Amino acid sequence: MRHIRRAQPEDANRIAEIEVFCYRLNFYPIFREDAFYFGEFQVTNRIGANQEHLDELLVYDDGVVKGFLRVADGEIKKLFVEPVLQGSGIGAKLLKYAVEQENARFLWALEKNEKAIAFYHRHGFRVTEERKFEEGTTEYLVRMELSR
């Protein structure tokens, strides 16, 4: 698919930027943990963490990396798009690629992340009965599976 490619080491900084901005936008309102979201969860800390999974990362790059996806063993582990570009179709393209080219069939979404659940639902994923706690929290994750 056009503009989607395997991540390279030089993408690590941009991937980390997108990840940190998306975490703050989507998860800070739920968890409200200042020390984590504005202290330890920094771009410089995420660069190395993402490089460890470079073989599982794909980026949407049309000259600038605008989104990324992590897929492993049929599971979508992460899918984030630069916040100011959300709603432009980049996430849908990454998700389609994950399903068609990487055989992605399921994911775990934070139960309170209604925006993410609605996005995946629009693209053929359904919430199952399976739930588990997000590690180290009292918030639930719900399992979503491709229903097509």
Where are the regions that the model predicts?
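Conserved GNAT-fold acetyl-CoA-binding loop/helix
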Residues: V20-I47
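Conserved beta-strand in the GNAT
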Residues: V59, V64-F80
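Conserved acetyl-CoA pyrophosphate-binding loop and the N-cap/start of the following alpha-helix
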Residues: L85-Y97
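A short helix-loop-beta-strand connector motif used in the catalytic cores of GNAT acetyltransferases and
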Residues: T44-L58, E75
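Conserved catalytic-core motifs of GNAT/GCN5-like acyltransferases
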Residues: W108-L110, R126-V142
